[in-house]
Amino acid sequence: MTANRHQIATYLTDYALSELVKYVMEDTGCDIEQAMDRVYNSPIMPALQDEENELYVQSPAYIYELMQQ
């Protein structure tokens, strides 16, 4: 993976994570710490961090739907 592609993947993953935390907070009413715990410990997290499967290019809303399954 080129450095530029890695930077893009990192940026998109970080963006998706911040949106996922917001979605969890909105849907559950929990605080940011609890929301981050739910997102970072969810089964979808390893797939989101895997740059080869490119889940990070999907919309945060789609990733959130996957996280809820």
Q: How should these model regions be labeled?
A:
Residues 1-69:
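C-terminal alpha-helical interaction appendages
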